[in-house]
Swiss-Prot record:
CDD domains: GH31_MGAM_SI_GAA (cd06602), GH31_N (cd14752), Trefoil (cd00111). Residues 992-1813 are annotated as: Sucrase. Its EC number is 3.2.1.48, 3.2.1.10. Substrate binds at D250, D374, R574, H648. The modification Sulfotyrosine is found at Y377, Y1294, Y1368, Y1371. It is found in: Apical cell membrane. This is Sucrase-isomaltase, intestinal. It comes from the Eukaryota. It catalyses: Hydrolysis of sucrose and maltose by an alpha-D-glucosidase-type action; Hydrolysis of (1->6)-alpha-D-glucosidic linkages in some oligosaccharides produced from starch and glycogen by alpha-amylase, and in isomaltose. Disulfide bonds join C48-C79, C62-C78, C73-C91, C506-C531, C621-C632. Belongs to the glycosyl hydrolase 31 family. Glycans are attached at residues 127, 388, 669, 791, 896, 911, 1221, 1289, 1326, 1340, 1432, 1521, 1545, 1558, 1703, 1772.
Length: 1813
């Protein structure tokens, strides 16, 4: 039944409907005049489409205002096709609706045919039967058509700039043609060049009635931008059946389609990747809605006026926008000061509150230019008044702003109160307006319309009335006489009313209730505004409503012209219309503090750029509701790149000006940072705004304007550009420190580092921590800059600069400068204009216009050039083509390839040329002849390298040619967890002949183990090579995620290289893209990398002169040898770990090469580093930090965190090599006790043994076991020495050797059962040593053959444990073991006959730079070909594992010690390798009693802290040579703060123990060791922390103060943890010491007083018996009263040193266990307490309570230092719920409070609270 009716309807429609015309430009219709013709096409009247031809996505809704029914659809003469769950219209137009075109003869693009209405029913009544179509070819790029009623004048927008009566001749050669279809009428606009239809109304009918106009157009592209004002969320329009109402409304933005403040009917569309684009503008101010559907089709539904369309064609999107602005008016040129940061708030409440905001932001050095006040400054919110009570003194405040170079902006609302002033006086503003009849009137035209806004009952100025303009101008002028404001903010001008329509309501008529109401908010025309039948000079409110803000902006501009003659000033408006930007700027209204609103601010910023309002921004941090610190911080970052930059929020919510968050808060710091960048870039922004004013260019720019050839750029709207050259990537997600960012197809440089990014035309994950925003400069552009200041008044006086970002060695830019405020400076030519260009290392600075004389005092003083691949050694400058002059003030940074030229004086108004060279320096050359063979030209050239004898003495004379690289990339495979790259030998490099033949095929594996750690290894995939058999603690499966990684890895193909970049800064920290950056041979491996910084630390086992590495061509060999440490001498340890601190905020990373073969590393100054090793593979681990201490912790996590020593081991240790008997030791012990010198541990060296045989006791020491038992009973501990070498020449049973033979534990010759015999300390039995023999003769005559245990074997560990346990149980007790000579050391070379059996292993083709380099690797150790056995049973050459010998001995020794004693114990090892610190401490070897060794010991301690061996120290007073009194005294002072504090020296030198000098020395020793013992709980807590978490105890200053570059070179001071600084004297005859005082509060340990120094070097008083010690404010140190040893001190009262910081806060921790049990932390058998000071309250919090010996945890004393000047009257403690008063004393003048708790019985395992008043 339904189907039958539908069929009948279709037949009826065929008969009744008439078909209208379609317009399009025909390419073939060209008249001889080159003016395109209009092609007319006749069509046959149609009907509803058949089912097969029914395009659902092309249906145009016939019933847009209500839910359709079939009956209603039939009544409208439309087509019914309901579809469930479909957004397509159920009722759509048939193709016989619309108008019929009246034919004309000889049409062209400028013509005026008539249109006649077809017969179908009207939609909303009052159809207009006859219409007039007017078309105009206005320019080659702009086509206009309008449709009007020829019989009745309809409302047309009285725009102040657009000429509605265009009368010019048709454009010749336009880019478009037009095609018209006659019936039904339609029009098409076609691009000539490609026949693409841009605008096609044939998709739907023209509807034209008195109060309803509809037209649809089909578009060629789905990429549409514009229309407003709404929250579109995305810049590219969502085409999925969206309705956007346009009608100005006081409505805050939200997640909806509400119509907002502005009326903007322009949109733009990009057509294809050629950039061709078009725009459409409807000049109509009536309420409307624009409906967009997916085809895409755009339908306009307008309720008044006319249809007046402008179509713009451009070759690029930017051209289209320029053409639109050419029509509607280009934006105003803002005053320079208005570009500065503005602070504002609604409802400060009082002037005092405003003053406080200004003060705190000035104090925080927040640059800002203008203070804004909202309506709360007014009296009762009345315009042109101010509140004499709450804002008393406002004129004086404004003067203060002006005196500080700042401006004052006031708000003015349009609504004028009709009530008197508060004092009863007349409100003159209202009275004068009444007299001049300037108000909006009711429909009678005579009665002012009364509404209600902020002041209460109000009238509304009619700004379209010329009289009103005069009145408004006069009021602004009068008020300026009273308050010297500088700019005006006009608000509420949509126009807004708090009552609907008026206080009387609105009449029931078709203006207030039209037949069709667009989808506006509330669906009521006069909701929150005035009645639509109200009368204005330009017409009825129905027509002109959306022009209210526009007309007010024009009126305000006129007022400004009077108030500030010839000045630009500043006008900010909320409501806008097309062309408003010519008169005012705009902000995005009353937003919400939410992450969504911050994100959504980017799209309208870009949209208003289209609309001709580029000076645009949002309320930073949000307007309504409380913001959050994180949101506000991120918003300040993005806001710094809004063209208009204002922080504004509503009353009743928290303040959100930057300084409110704290003077040193992260928000303030990042805000200041980016404000400084903002002010630095203001010349660039001003230049962009100049080009917007002159040419109509955009400022904040979407990617598609610049990169239209890349379709990815068409949808990007979470990033934006400033002009062409600056890319901004904000963080828009809560809690995020990474943003998925698209990097357009260009060269990009990190703005802050200058480093070149490798990204291009790709999506990347950009790491942006809490204080960072992504900011990148585009290659090929030059950006003008100026040194920032606190405001533009100051900054405009500062020197100018240029940032030149090169692309293919070229760049361009321009610069505009005027006085920043004159109204017509451009029109009058009073400005300076420059163009810049760079080509081939030459910058031309060309002044094209100079008529601003005052500006010529400014000069370009700094030029920064990014992207210079080679070093610059010369810069020349020339003025006005004169002779060039050498300019010497410049710096080239190789790490980021940038050049900074400073101290220039290139004054404005002149032309200049700046030239620079690019050369390859000696410092960049890679040594081609590192081996020990004679280096000369012949040998060099035979190798295939380049010879340059005139190179610097330090640099290589023989070096690799740049164009060669041994390996090429064959294939690359990427995965989410890493990269695998296969490399093949580059045959083109065959002429380079290195020590052996390269391996032809290599494989690189990169593994992204963690977000802050990665590994890459390079090996031979075809032949198994030796790899270090040490397990690393790394995830079985990588745990990193792409989004969260701190690094990016880039594989370069030619030359092959690995680049690793820190995401947060863009800095490349590993870059092996160097000539011969990789070479891998069987016995020679080389890899080179550029370094990002000259601040490099680490590489152990070699003596360094300072902590920071010297990069001036220094080579450091690493190979374990029994060799006392000395400069460049390879010594006991092998530690291939370094970290680098970068010059960008203290970022640091660590690099660890897991390789145990002999190697050397070479630093060179460019800076770069080359590793050369003679075996194994390359296996690198990188740790990203980001600061030095964190990078170190990450390294320790991989190799194993440091061992936790027993508490007693932190006491003082005494030892000597050369004790003759037990009596000598006993006497020493008694003397130490008698002198009350604290000490815990006594040693004996090998002299306690029989003939230096392990596990024996010599004749003079038979009573040693009893002595040891005695002192252990008195709280002491004993440590014995064990050497690895086991004698094999014994005539009596020697069980250690015999059981070793049985267990097969000794190192052998390869493929035999023969032991490789050596000689060390053990003597032959029954031999008398002849003292007249030389050392070598004595070794041959008296030393026994010894065998070295192979500690890599499992059986050896078992044998070793048996020997240790047997000696402990059978002979004597001990508490710790000292393992020495374990490099391993031998007194013969290789074997007892000084011969080895494999030449190439002991004398490899490349011999690293080792001590005795020519003597072979076997010098004073085993032969390299000897064979050892791994735990898995496989054999390995000593050649590969030599450096693991001491490491392999450490764990078996530690395990045996703990098994034997049942206690934690301590092992001290001389030889080390990475991870040895898990089981052993280390001393720095056999040093000399020289002054320089004291300083070297600090370097060694700090280095071994990096290496994960924190329990370390040097032999106090020196091992070799006689010490002297002053040297030993100073060494005792610094040694008291070694983690491992031991006095030790060699036989046949004078005694140097503390009691061996005199009583004064002994007393000094007591005093300094008492300080140590007092601090042991703090020290022990630090040792626990690194055991649990990794890190350092002995800490370089830069680890705590990494952002302070002054700490980066310090190596004669150190920290204990974060809080305790030691500044010793390390020079002879000195009674003062110069130390660095980092930025913080420091309190003298000896006096408790603030030293009042920060961030500077200072000379401190240091007489002989004083060492300078300081505590860092903000920390709490747990202490304990000292005693003779730790057994007794642990029973004394605890105390706290509370060192307050500047804010009277501090924090600290105490870890406490029994001090000796095994794995107390792992078993939870400990106490962990956190202490906090907050002002005058000290609290403790129990974090873990697993230790029960309360006797050791009694809190007796608290010393509060730096407490403030307030005199304390009372101290109370709350403990176990009880509050008590406590005893105290104070030194008020020193800010010291001493609290005595001994009477209160306080135990730390319960929380406490202590407060004082």
């Amino acid at each position: 039944m339904a189907r039958k009716k539908s069929s009948g309807l279709k037949i009826t429609l065929i008969v009744l409907l008439a078909i209208v015309t379609i317009i399009a430009i025909a390419l073939v219709a060209i008249l001889p005049t080159k003016t395109p013709a209009v092609e007319l096409v006749s069509t046959i009247p149609g009907k509803c489409p058949s089912a097969e031809n029914d395009r659902l996505d092309e249906k145009i809704n016939c019933i847009p205002d209500q839910f359709p029914t079939q009956a209603l659809c039939a009544m409208q003469g439309c087509c019914w096709n309901p579809r469930n769950e479909s957004p397509t219209p159920w009722c759509s137009f048939a193709n016989n609706h619309g108008y019929e075109f009246e034919k004309i003869s000889n049409p062209n693009i400028n013509f005026e045919p008539n249109l006649k209405k077809n017969s179908p029913p009207t939609l909303f009544g009052d159809n207009i039967t006859n219409l007039l179509l007017t078309t105009q070819s206005q320019t080659a790029n702009r086509f206009r058509f309008k449709i009007t009623d020829p019989n009745n004048q309809r409302y047309e927008v009285p725009h102040q700039f657009v000429n509605k009566d265009f009368s010019g001749p048709p454009a010749s050669n336009p880019l478009y043609d037009v095609k018209i279809t006659e019936n039904p009428f339609s029009i098409k606009v076609i691009r000539k060049s490609n026949n693409k239809i841009l605008f096609d109304t044939s998709i739907g009918p023209l509807v034209y009635s008195n109060q309803y106009l509809q037209i649809s157009t089909k578009l060629p592209s789905k990429y549409i931008y514009g229309l407003g004002e709404h929250v579109h969320k995305r810049f590219r329009h969502d085409l999925y059946w969206k309705t956007w109402p346009i009608f100005t409304r006081d409505q805050l933005p939200g997640d909806n389609n509400n119509n907002l403040y502005g009326h903007q009917t322009f949109f733009m569309s990009i057509e294809d990747t050629s950039g061709k684009s078009f725009g459409v503008f409807l000049m109509n101010s009536n309420a409307m809605e624009v409906f967009i559907q997916p085809t895409p089709i755009v339908t306009y539904r307008v309720i008044g006026g006319i249809l007046d369309f402008y179509i713009f064609l451009g070759d690029t999107p930017g051209q289209v926008v320029q053409q639109y602005q050419e029509l509607t008016g280009r934006p105003a040129m803002p005053s320079y000061w208005s570009l500065g940061f503005q602070l504002s708030r609604w409802n400060y409440g009082s002037l005092d509150a405003v003053k406080e905001v200004v003060k705190r932001n000035r104090d925080a050095r927040i640059p800002f230019d203008a203070q804004v006040t909202d309506i709360d400054y007014m009296e009762d919110k009345k315009d042109f008044t101010y509140n004499n009570k709450t804002f008393y003194g406002l004129p004086e405040f404004v003067k203060d702003l002006h005196d500080h170079g700042q401006k004052y902006i006031i708000i003015l609302d349009p609504a004028i109160s009709i009530t008197s002033l508060a004092n009863g006086n007349h409100y003159k503003t209202y009275e004068r307006g009444n007299e001049q009849k300037v108000w909006v009137y009711q429909s009678d035209g005579t009665t002012p319309l009364i509404g209600e806004v902020w002041p209460g009952l109000t009238v509304y100025p009619d700004f379209t009335n010329p009289k009103c303009l005069d009145w408004w101008t006069n009021e602004c002028s009068i008020f300026h006489e009273e308050i010297k404001y500088d700019g005006l903010w006009i608000d509420m001008n949509e126009v807004s009313s708090f009552v609907h329509g008026s206080t009387k309501g609105c009449s029931d008529n078709k203006l207030n209730y039209p037949p069709f109401i667009p989808d506006i908010l509330d669906k009521l025309m006069y909701a929150k505004t005035i009645c639509m039948d109200a009368i204005q000079h330009w017409g009825k409110q129905y027509d002109v409503h959306s022009l209210y803000g526009y007309s007010m902006a024009i009126a305000t501009e006129k007022a400004i012209e009077k108030v500030f003659p010839n000045k630009r000033s500043f006008i900010l408006t909320r409501s806008t219309f097309a062309g408003t930007g010519k008169h005012a700027t705009h902000w995005l209204g009353d937003n919400t503090p939410s992450w969504e609103h911050m994100e959504w601010s980017i799209t309208p910023m870009l949209e208003f750029g289209l609309f001709g309002m580029p000076f645009i921004g949002a309320d930073i941090c949000g307007f309504v509701v409380d913001t959050t610190e994180e949101l506000c911080r991120r918003w300040m970052q993005i806001g710094a790149f809004y063209p208009y930059f204002r922080d504004h929020n509503a009353g009743g919510y928290m303040p959100q000006d930057p300084a409110y968050f704290g003077q040193d808060s992260l928000l303030v710091n990042t805000s200041r940072h980016y404000l400084d960048i903002w002010y630095t870039l203001l010349p660039y922004l001003y230049n962009l705004l100049y080009k917007a004013y002159v040419y109509g260019e955009t400022v904040a720019r979407p990617f598609l304007y610049e990169f239209y050839e890349d379709t990815n750029s068409w949808i990007e709207d979470l990033q934006f550009l400033w002009g062409s050259a600056l890319l901004i990537t904000p963080v828009l997600r809560q809690g995020a420190d990474r943003m998925s960012a698209y990097i357009p197809d260009a060269t990009w440089y990190d703005y802050e580092t200058g480093g070149k990014r490798t990204w291009r035309k790709q999506r990347v994950e950009m790491y942006l921590p809490g204080d960072k925003i992504g900011l990148h400069v585009r290659g090929g552009y030059i950006i003008p800059t100026q040194q920032p200041a606190v405001n533009t008044t100051a900054s405009r006086k500062n020197p100018l600069g240029l940032i030149i970002a090169l692309d293919n060695n070229a760049a361009k830019g321009d610069f505009f400068w005027d006085d920043g405020e004159s109204k017509d400076s451009i029109e009058k030519g009073k400005y300076i204009l420059y163009t810049f260009s760079v080509l081939n290392n030459e910058l031309d600075i060309i002044c094209t216009h100079s008529s601003y004389q005052e500006g010529t005092t400014l000069a370009f003083e700094t030029i920064k050039i990014l992207g210079l691949a080679n070093t610059v050694t010369q810069v020349q400058v020339a003025e006005n083509n004169q002779q060039t002059i050498i300019h010497n003030s410049f710096t080239y940074h190789a790490s980021n390839q940038s050049l900074i030229i400073d101290n220039l004086k290139l004054n404005l108004g002149k032309n200049f040329t700046v030239q620079w060279n690019q050369v390859s320096l000696d410092s960049e050359k890679i040594d081609c002849f590192p081996d020990n063979n004679p280096e000369n030209k012949q040998n060099c050239e035979e190798r295939g390298c380049l010879w340059e004898p005139n190179s610097a003495a330090e640099g290589p004379r023989c070096y690799f040619p740049k164009q060669y690289n041994p390996y090429l990339v064959k294939s690359t495979q990427y995965s989410s967890m890493g990269i695998t790259v296969d490399l093949e030998l580059n045959t083109a490099t065959a002429r380079i002949k290195m020590p052996s033949n390269p391996i032809s095929v290599l494989r690189l594996e990169v593994k992204y183990h963690k977000n802050d750690m990665l590994q890459f290894k390079i090996y031979d995939p075809q032949n198994k090579r030796y790899e270090v058999p040490i397990p690393m603690d790394i995830p079985t499966t990588p745990t990193s995620t792409y989004e969260n990684r701190l690094y990016d890895v880039n594989i370069k193909g030619n030359p092959f290289g690995i680049q690793i970049r820190r995401r947060s800064t863009g800095r490349i920290f590993w870059d092996s893209c160097l000539p011969w950056g990789l070479l891998l041979m069987n016995q020679f491996i080389q890899i080179s990398t550029r370094l990002p910084s000259e601040y490099v630390y680490g590489f152990g086992g070699v003596g360094h002169r300072q902590f920071k590495q010297d990069l001036n061509w220094h080579k450091w060999g690493m190979f374990n040898r029994d060799q006392p440490s000395g400069y460049k001498i390879s010594s006991y340890g092998f530690q291939p770990y370094i970290y680098m601190a970068l010059g960008d905020g203290g970022n640091a990373h660590g690099v660890f090469l897991l390789n145990s073969n002999a190697m050397d590393v070479t630093f060179q100054p460019n800076p770069a580093l080359t590793y050369r090793t003679i075996g194994g593979i390359l296996d690198f681990y990188m740790f990203l930090g980001p600061n030095p201490e964190v990078a170190t912790k990450q390294y320790h996590e991989v190799i194993g965190r440091p061992v936790k020593p027993p508490y007693w081991a932190l006491g003082f240790h005494l030892c000597r090599y050369g004790y003759e008997n037990t009596s000598e030791i006993r006497q020493l012990y008694e003397d130490m006790v008698s002198a009350q010198i604290p000490y815990d541990v006594q040693y004996t060296d090998i002299d306690y043994m029989e003939r230096q045989l392990d596990f024996t006791i010599g004749k003079g020491f038979q009573d040693l076991p009893e002595f040891v038992d005695k002192i252990r009973d008195e709280g002491m501990k004993y440590i014995i020495i064990l050497d690895p070498a086991i004698s094999g020449n014994e005539t009596q049973d020697y069980l250690a050797f015999q059981r070793g033979i049985e267990k097969d534990v000794f190192v052998k010759w390869p493929n035999t059962q023969d032991i490789c015999w050596a000689k060390v300390w053990p003597d032959l039995p029954n031999i008398t040593i002849d003292d007249s023999l030389t050392e070598d003769e004595a070794v041959n005559a008296s030393r026994a053959h010894v065998a070295f245990p192979d500690f890599l074997k499992t059986s050896t560990a078992e044998w070793w444990a048996t020997e240790i346990e047997d000696f402990y149980n059978t002979y004597m007790k001990f508490d710790g073991l000292w393992i020495d000579m374990n490099e391993p050391s031998s007194f013969v070379h290789g074997s007892v006959d000084n011969k080895c059996r494999n030449e190439i292993l002991n004398y490899p083709p490349y011999m690293p730079a080792l001590t005795k380099r020519n003597e072979g690797l076997h010098f004073r150790t085993m032969c390299m070909e000897t064979q050892q056995t791994l735990s898995n049973g496989s054999s390995v050459l000593h050649y590969d594992v030599h450096n693991l010998y001491g490491w392999s001995q450490a764990k078996p020794t530690y395990d045996a010690l703990q098994k034997t004693t049942g206690k934690r114990g301590i092992v001290i090892s001389r030889s080390t390798y990475p991870s040895a610190g898990r089981w052993a401490g280390h001393w720095l070897g056999d040093n000399y009693a020289n002054w320089d060794k004291i300083g070297k010991s600090i370097i060694g301690m700090m280095e071994f802290s990096l290496f994960g061996i924190s329990f370390t120290g040097a032999d106090i007073c020196g091992f070799f040579n006689n010490s002297d009194y002053e040297l030993c005294a100073r060494w005792m002072q610094v040694g008291a703060f070694y983690p491992y504090s031991r006095n030790h020296n060699i036989t046949d030198t004078r005694r140097q123990d503390p009691v061996s000098w005199n009583e004064t020395f002994a007393s000094m020793s007591t005093d300094i060791l008492n300080i140590r013992y007092n601090l042991l709980p703090y020290f022990y807590t630090q040792m626990h922390d690194i055991h649990a978490n990794g890190g350092t105890v002995i800490r370089p200053l830069l680890h705590e103060f990494f952002s302070e570059t002054g700490t980066w070179d310090i190596y004669k001071q150190f920290l204990w943890g974060p809080a305790f600084m030691v500044t010793p004297v390390v020079e002879p005859y000195s009674e003062s010491v110069t130390g660095y005082v980092p930025d913080g509060r420091w309190l003298d340990y000896h006096t408790g007083q603030d030293i009042g120094l920060r961030k500077r070097l200072h000379t401190l008083d240091a007489p002989l018996y004083k060492i300078n010690l300081h505590v860092c404010g903000g920390h709490i140190l747990p202490c304990q009263e000292p005693a003779q040893n730790t057994y007794f001190s642990r029973q004394n009262y605890m105390k706290l040193i509370v060192a307050a910081d500047d804010n009277q806060t501090a924090q600290g921790y105490l870890f406490w266990d029994d001090g000796e049990s095994i794995d107390t932390y792992e078993k939870g058998q400990y106490l962990l307490v956190q202490f906090n000071l907050n002002k005058a309250t000290l609290t403790s919090t129990i974090l873990k309570n697993g230790y029960i010996n309360t006797r050791e945890m009694r809190l007796g004393f608290i010393n509060v230092w730096g407490k403030g000047n307030t005199v304390v009257q009372e101290v109370n403690i709350t403990y176990k719920g009880n509050k008590e008063s406590v005893k105290f004393s104070q030194e008020a003048n020193k800010q010291i409070l001493n609290i005595d708790l001994t009477a209160n019985n306080i135990v730390l395992d319960e929380p406490i609270e202590i407060s004082w008043t």
